[in-house]
Amino acid sequence: RQMCIRDRSIAEIDEEMIQKLLSWQQNGGISTTDEFHKCSREMQREIVDFISDFELYDEIEVNGQKFVLVHAGLGNFMPNKELWKYELNDLIWERPDCEKCYYSDKFVITGHTPTMLIENNPRPGYIYKKNNHIAIDCGCGFRGGRLGCLRLEDMEEFYVDSEE
């Protein structure tokens, strides 16, 4: 289905939406769009179908340990709030509060915020663990960043340095 700009949709565009679009473009959106357009129509459909199947969050258990997997954070967090009640923006844009322990009985694993941007982080650019929170975005898209991977079975960390 093709999305079209209509009078109604133009009226819904506000300054905040424009700023978010510009930020997305500056943070890899332009190159992502360019690469997407190089794909065949069939591949584009497969990519859209694949992304459409993504969940906003997941709750898993590995070796008896519970984890909440979420892209960004838990914006507007309340301890008794069910995960399905969070807004899209809360899960994909709101940065986590690394000084807060969201849950005492499970770990929250986030991406979105490169660990070199976490205040008072003793290991910028590496997986960050504090307060039952694990931040795994090691800034691969930044100079000096890397791709980080955490094996949940034994919490071993793996890294690949980014190419500059």
Enumerate the language-model features and the residues they cover.
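Short, small-residue-biased leader/transition segments that mark boundaries at the very start
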Residues: R1-I5
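Acidic, His/Gly-enriched loop-helix segments that form or flank divalent-metal centers
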Residues: E12-M17, L22-A135, G139-G145, E156
